[in-house]
Structures are given as structure tokens and as C-alpha cells.
């Protein structure tokens, strides 16, 4: 007999079900981070990496990259939230991890070959500490941060508009914007961690892991930009 899918959120489930859901979510998050590292390392060692970076960053190609990434992200999240099959959910998570690795390639290529060797480890440690602190706050306070959803949606559209304007008119966003985006990513981590405790169904651990991974990746991107900027000023 086929198992019936969960219909109620994990917030209404028993303690053992919640604990199992949280454990599986963070296991899948760890797997996504590890997968990202492996794919990124392979891309950086690939002989065609330099040419791909030039193609991605030349002219208005970055618009195409961003549009493709947004489309892939939408598709991946839809697959990950699918209740049809576990295979489709895992396909969504894997697709998103690969897409993140590709869009990170230009930034990490520059950080690897043209910046201090300490910038990537430093950014990784800072991101991990911020993520750990925000996760601790969300789990210890047990507050429902779902109210952040509308704020994050509005902020995301504003940030996207600023990024597109910078690409069109060629101005640098600078460290201040990067700092604001780190704060935005922190809000997204609080929001998604709260959803893990209150909103997701017990069978949506893959989707929950994808949402957390997206927030962590966003934070790492802008923390790395800040660290690279500070390193270049030394």
C-alpha cells in the first residue's frame, strides 16, 4: 500500500516527527553544501573555466546568466516541493546546487587566482558563524518569523532592480550594498529556519534544505565580496 503524504505542517506533528524532519533537513543541507564544493572545485580545475568566465562576464552576457539562473531556480524549487516522488525532489535540489556552482564560478575564479588565498576560507568561516548564530536564535526563541516573508519579497525585488541598474549603467555597488545583502540573507535564514519549525510538511525536508541552501549561498556570495574588497585595500 502506498504511504499517504503528510497534509499538516511539522508544527502540528509530534516531537519525534519534528526532530526527524529537522535532522533530515540539515543532513540534506550539509549534502548540498558538500555537493556545491565538489562541483565548484571541478569547475575551477576545468581547463575551459577561464573561457567560460569570460563568456559569462563579457558584455551583457551576465543578464542572460541571471535570467537563466532565475529560471532554473524556479524549476528546481518547484521540483523540490513536488509531492509526486522523492526522485523529483532530489532532482530539484541537485539542479539548484549545480546552478549555484555555475553562477558562483566567475566570483570564485577571481578569488582563487587573483586574490589573497585566505579570502575564500575567511568568507566560509564568517558565513558559517553567522548561519550558526542565526539558527541558534531561531531555534531557542522558537519565534515564528513568517512575517519576514513579505519584507524579503519586497527587498528582493528592490535588490534585483539595483543589480540590473548597476549592470546597465556600469556603476559599482560597493561594500555598503554587500553589507545590506548580508543582512538580507540573514533575514532569509531566520525566515527559512522558522518555516522548518512551523510551515513545512514533514515530507518536505528536501525543499526545506533547498531554501536554506539558497539563503546560505546568498550570504556567502556577499560575505566573500566584502572580504575580497577588504583584502584588495590592504
Predicted regions and their residues:
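A hydrophobic alpha-helical transmembrane-helix feature that marks the membrane cores
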Residues: 1-234
Amino acid at each position: 500500500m502506498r504511504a499517504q503524504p503528510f497534509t499538516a505542517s511539522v508544527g502540528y506533528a509530534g516531537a519525534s516527527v519534528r526532530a526527524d524532519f529537522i535532522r533530515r533537513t540539515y543532513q540534506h543541507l550539509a549534502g548540498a553544501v558538500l555537493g556545491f564544493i565538489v562541483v565548484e572545485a571541478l569547475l575551477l580545475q576545468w581547463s575551459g573555466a577561464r573561457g567560460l568566465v569570460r563568456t559569462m562576464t563579457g558584455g551583457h552576457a551576465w543578464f542572460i546568466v541571471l535570467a537563466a539562473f532565475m529560471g532554473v531556480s524556479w524549476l528546481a524549487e518547484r521540483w523540490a516541493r513536488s509531492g509526486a516522488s522523492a526522485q523529483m525532489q532530489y532532482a530539484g535540489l541537485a539542479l539548484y546546487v549545480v546552478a549555484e556552482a555555475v553562477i558562483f564560478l566567475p566570483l570564485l575564479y577571481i578569488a582563487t587566482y587573483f586574490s589573497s588565498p585566505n579570502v575564500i576560507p575567511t568568507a566560509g568561516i564568517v558565513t558559517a558563524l553567522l548561519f550558526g548564530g542565526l539558527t541558534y536564535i531561531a531555534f531557542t526563541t522558537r519565534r515564528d518569523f513568517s512575517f519576514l516573508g513579505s519584507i524579503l519579497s519586497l527587498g528582493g525585488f528592490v535588490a534585483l532592480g539595483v543589480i540590473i541598474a548597476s549592470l546597465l549603467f556600469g556603476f559599482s555597488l560597493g561594500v555598503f550594498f554587500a553589507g545590506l545583502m548580508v543582512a538580507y540573507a540573514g533575514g532569509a535564514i531566520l525566515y527559512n529556519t522558522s518555516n522548518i519549525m512551523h510551515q513545512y510538511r514533514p515530507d518536505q525536508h528536501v525543499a526545506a534544505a533547498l531554501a536554506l541552501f539558497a539563503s546560505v549561498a546568498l550570504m556567502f556570495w556577499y560575505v566573500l565580496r566584502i572580504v575580497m574588497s577588504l583584502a584588495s585595500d590592504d
